[in-house]
Amino acid sequence: MDNIDKTMKFDYEEIPKDNVETVLNNVHRTLEERGYNAVNQIVGYLLSGDPAYIPRQNDARNQIRHIDRDVIMEELVSNYLKENKK
């Protein structure tokens, strides 16, 4: 049986949710301290993968680069849906 006929499972190393939260809070705070629109900058980073959207101040750029963007997006969507469940 060819590998093309098999279903692939997406699996990634589990990153503690509190770590993602801590990093995003630090990035958000840092962006606001620098006078940027934090949401726009984070979205720019998530869509493009370009770390230039995140400042180096407070080690924010280094921290966010250590978390896969898919993991960050998953966490953001999950939290949004929990908070806005009707």
From Swiss-Prot:
Transmembrane segments: none annotated. Coiled coil: none annotated. Belongs to the UPF0297 family. This is UPF0297 protein SH1302. The lineage of its organism: Bacteria, Bacillati, Bacillota, Bacilli, Bacillales.
